[in-house]
């Protein structure tokens, strides 16, 4: 909690400072870059993937920039019907866009080693022709201004090996997804601003919506296998954190740019979808504990790896703490969770708050928990434009309270699910 509060506070300070300092105008790019938009896909809905690709390429075609952009759809799809749909969508895309738009599509018969090997194969076969690659997920969408800005930044900073944008969630339709989207847009920015400030040039990579210097990545970001607890060699599942650490170890800057607007991704529609994704992430993040001792990693890169793993280990730790508390309190005189007794089976016996200090501690804990949300909400309410986008102060406040309520409701479910995910990862 303290890290989140500190990061959000730094983000608030950074936000106010930026508003008071006039932004400098960048000169034209130092070098024109050939940029590949690389989209790895696996059994995805072709309409969504190719629809997003069409929107990005159409905007880039009319964008005022000297950079050149090409699209690579890298498919690991194993379902023959979806593969046929991808081929038809590719033909439609080819016929829709101007003739000089460079588009490639390739499908592997076997999805060996998943996404890291897709990128490695692309680098070995095509990477030499492109100074940079913009890695996108199947559900990623970026505006032309965001893409051009990232290419300009990479061009201006020859020491940068990777620049990560901060994707906003979009396309939410269910209550769960809308809650995630509201939280991301409203409360995510102070955390993103703060992360960009303290991470500086030792940032992280989230696997998509990031531009990477191809030569830098090819020279130092090859992934080894990591041994499991049982001693077997395993693929590194959450490869992005590790690749960022390897780039920084080789001397390349890994930057996080929270100020880039127009970077988007979708969010899981239901709690079940979220949990299934979280299980994969949990397994990958726990693998990072075996990579932390790697020689030469920057201290901040090690912190990113440890922090990702600890975020999942806290769930079983909290669950164990609750179980110990329940067992130790299992008695007539010491029971801390029983609100009924034999003499008064229908009337609850509420815990006695011994003094003012207990209330202060309770308020402090909840204040720390809610501080990032409160910081984001205050800034949103202070802006007339933001209030108007949310439908006014009353509607924003109602959404804010609903988000807090649903977060509290989902918290014990996610604690149990993450505990199960940790146990399955052992």
Regions found by a protein language model. Give the residues of each.
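Alpha-helical membrane-embedded segments
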Residues: 1-14, 367-370
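Internal catalytic domains of large membrane-associated glycosyltransferases
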Residues: 6-10, 16-296
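Basic/Trp-rich segment in TM-proximal cytosolic loops or flexible interdomain/linker regions
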Residues: 17-26, 200, 267-426
